[in-house]
A protein has these predicted regions:
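Metal-cofactor-binding active-site regions of metalloenzymes
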Residues: 17
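Structured beta-strand/loop patches that form or line metal/cofactor-binding pockets in enzymes
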Residues: 169
Length: 178
């Protein structure tokens, strides 16, 4: 296969291995790779961590302010977008609560689905490059068959122009995502 690769870290990976150590290893591997390699911060938990990733050479950053109020999520996301813009580093944001548990993230029971109108306003006010939405996916293992709110996803797609991201979709059957 000649597919591009995305190497990503979460805040718990950074805490365990250290950002500089991890990045040095990934950069060494990327230099030897015969395909493009992106280095992504997943679920960046703070402005400070996002800036550390930006300074050390990450090629894309996710700031996850979904645990904050709507206005605070907008504020932290816009701050990260503004800081990344001069370097043309794309910023993914999250709106809504993706259920389940992964690393130190606890999305609860997944009942905080993304509201389409809030998604439109959020993207307009922040300038995020992509938006992770909550439509029924969950981090970690599924207890039963995932039930995705396809209609909600369609409604969000109609009012949001940036790419939409589904976290927790690795346990979702391919046909449910198509």
């Amino acid at each position: 296969l000649q597919s591009p690769v995305i190497m990503q870290t979460t805040p718990s990976t950074v805490k365990y291995a250290g950002l500089d150590y991890y990045l040095a290893n990934v950069k060494a591997a990327a230099e030897r790779a015969k395909v493009p390699v992106a280095i992504h911060l997943d679920h960046g938990s703070s402005y400070g961590l996002a800036m550390q990733a930006l300074r050390t050479g990450y090629t894309s950053i996710m700031i996850d302010g979904s645990h904050e109020s709507f206005e605070d999520n907008i504020a932290v996301t816009k701050s990260v977008v503004d800081a990344c813009a001069p370097s043309a580093i794309p910023v993914e944001a999250e709106l809504g609560k993706v259920g389940g548990k992964e690393d130190d993230l606890d999305g609860g029971d997944g009942d905080g689905y993304t509201d389409p109108e809030q998604a439109r306003e959020f993207v307009e006010r922040t300038g995020a490059s992509s938006l992770a939405v909550a439509i029924g996916t969950a981090h970690g293992l599924y207890k039963g068959e995932p039930k995705l709110d396809q209609e909600r996803l369609w409604e969000i797609r109609q009012v949001v122009s940036v790419p939409l991201v589904l976290h927790g979709a690795s346990g979702v059957p391919d046909e449910a995502v198509r």
